[in-house]
């Protein structure tokens, strides 16, 4: 792994990753798409371990979108079984390393067996105090905003909340990652330059890093290159460059 000596103040606190390119990578090898998904697991391990060593507070991995159900039934079935297998084989290592696992998204569509496995994995690591690893599965940014809106509407209906009480902070508290900082750095592999309905609210001020590397080939050095690119960015949050520099000097 490359050396990266940086202050925690300049590192991203929350990294989100759209893990793209498994199918195209497999095709280039003359293999079926599922071969790419299985080989992508190694990149997940590397990303989690490297992020933890860097001191990142949270990593969110886009594993399965709400739109991915449209894929061939066989591929979806393999992805669900792969999810089960990875939960079974990786959770003890995450727990040993004091990492906390959470699965975000609409889990009701998963099989009871998978829902049980998810609940067990989350419960095992719930008290861990290290990096939070979010797996976004059957997740969509529009769904996240919709479920938050429905929850707020229910509170208004029940008289627990007035419409005038709802501001950005209140709304955020009803999103699936309310207790985490918004995303600082979004990484998407495979050369595609879009966010694909991922964390629409939380990406408001994220720096977006697009790499041509297919996900199965994304390693420690690739992640460090992305983080290095991030720390050299000037994040403005709506201010001018001069205003940002003045704030940094104070």
UniProtKB/Swiss-Prot annotation:
Annotated catalytic residues: 20, 68 (proton acceptor)
Any Gene Ontology biological process: cell wall organization
Catalytic reactions of this protein: 8 isopentenyl diphosphate + (2E,6E)-farnesyl diphosphate = di-trans,octa-cis-undecaprenyl diphosphate + 8 diphosphate
Classification via CDD domains: Cis_IPPS
Cofactor comment text: Binds 2 magnesium ions per subunit.
InterPro entries tied to this protein: UPP_synth-like, UPP_synth-like_CS, UPP_synth-like_sf
Binding residues annotated for Mg(2+), in chain numbering: 20, 207
Enzyme Commission code(s) on record: 2.5.1.31
GO molecular function terms noted in the UniProt entry: ditrans,polycis-undecaprenyl-diphosphate synthase [(2E,6E)-farnesyl-diphosphate specific] activity; magnesium ion binding
GO CC, any one term: cytosol
Keywords: Cell shape, Cell wall biogenesis/degradation, Magnesium, Metal-binding, Peptidoglycan synthesis, Transferase
Signal peptide (residue range): none
Cofactor: Mg(2+)
The keyword Magnesium appears for this protein: yes
Keyword Metal-binding: yes
Binding site for substrate: 21-25, 33, 37, 65-67, 69, 71, 188, 194-196
Quaternary structure and partners: Homodimer.
Matching HAMAP family: ISPT (MF_01139)
Function: Catalyzes the sequential condensation of isopentenyl diphosphate (IPP) with (2E,6E)-farnesyl diphosphate (E,E-FPP) to yield (2Z,6Z,10Z,14Z,18Z,22Z,26Z,30Z,34E,38E)-undecaprenyl diphosphate (di-trans,octa-cis-UPP). UPP is the precursor of glycosyl carrier lipid in the biosynthesis of bacterial cell wall polysaccharide components such as peptidoglycan and lipopolysaccharide.
Family note: Belongs to the UPP synthase family.
Name of protein: Ditrans,polycis-undecaprenyl-diphosphate synthase ((2E,6E)-farnesyl-diphosphate specific)
Organism: Vibrio cholerae serotype O1 (strain ATCC 39315 / El Tor Inaba N16961)
């Amino acid at each position: 792994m490359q050396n990266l000596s940086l202050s925690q103040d300049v590192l991203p606190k929350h990294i989100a990753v759209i893990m793209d390119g498994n199918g195209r990578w497999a095709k280039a090898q003359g293999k079926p798409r599922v071969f790419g998904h299985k080989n992508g697991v190694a990149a997940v391990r590397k990303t989690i371990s490297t992020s933890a060593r860097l001191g990142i507070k949270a990593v969110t991995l886009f594993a399965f979108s709400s739109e991915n159900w449209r894929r061939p039934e066989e591929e979806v079935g393999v992805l669900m079984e792969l999810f089960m297998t990875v939960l079974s084989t990786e959770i003890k290592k995450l727990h040993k390393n004091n990492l906390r696992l959470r699965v975000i998204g609409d889990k009701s569509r998963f099989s009871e067996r998978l829902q049980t496995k998810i609940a067990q994995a989350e419960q095992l690591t719930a008290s861990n105090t290290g990096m939070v690893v979010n797996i976004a599965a059957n997740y969509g940014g529009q769904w996240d905003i919709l479920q938050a809106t429905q929850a707020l509407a229910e509170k208004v209906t029940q008289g627990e909340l007035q419409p005038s009480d709802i501001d950005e902070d209140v709304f955020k508290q009803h999103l699936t990652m309310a207790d985490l900082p918004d995303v600082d750095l979004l990484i998407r592999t495979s050369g595609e330059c879009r966010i694909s309905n991922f964390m629409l609210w939380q990406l408001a001020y994220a720096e977006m890093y697009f790499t041509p590397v297919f996900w199965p080939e994304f390693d420690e050095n690739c992640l460090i290159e992305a983080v290095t690119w991030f720390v050299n960015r000037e994040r403005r949050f709506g201010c001018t460059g001069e205003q940002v520099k003045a704030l940094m000097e104070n």
